[in-house]
Amino acid sequence: KGRMVKKTDALGGRTAYEYVNGLLAKVTDPEGNETAYTYDANGNLASMTDALGNVTRYEYDGSGNLLSLTFADGTQVTYTYDALGRQTSMTDPRGNVTKYAYDALGNLIKTTLPDGTVQTAAYTKNGQQKSIADALGNKTSYTYDGNGNRLTVTDPAGNETLSEYDRAGNLLREINALGGVTEYTYDEVGLPLTVTDATGATQVMTYDLAGNLLTRTLPSGASISVAYD
């Protein structure tokens, strides 16, 4: 697939994308504001400079894990990892620490927030998230079909959203707790063509031969278009 070089929004505003050595180097928004990006020798994002000249810097360990974000004012967000490269903590600019714990399969099972409260998660034998619960016991639950497609989502209040799929695993229909239906159609290679929400409003997508999104026509009739190199 090609790289996005231009995106035209529904109002005709154009955003341009420029690349150096295959990496995104500059984004120019419809007002002419530029955001520039640099990379380290491993291709990791090293810095981002916004239109006002504010620089955010990124540092990594030898495995490519992000260790810190340093903002223009000198404040930082830092991250730690275990021997398997799983993130174990995040410290925000105010020193608040969020901690993460995993099961033997690498699934995130516990998040300890800065105030000490804990969120827990459970998984199926196939590693799919079965439930997530906060410190008060409010739980959201998920079920899946034999192909791993998510069938239901039940929120803490008992409201259930149902999903239906075709044989290829493409999402065809979502039915919310109020009976509202969102429907999806696809082309012969599985690219989404239309999305129709519960009010009957439809978005329509078109693609080039490489499968790149070319246009998205909104329910209002306005269109978003994309060009590639």
Language model: regions and residue ranges:
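Beta-strand elements of repeat-based all-beta scaffolds
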Residues: 3-9, 13-29, 33-50, 54-71, ...
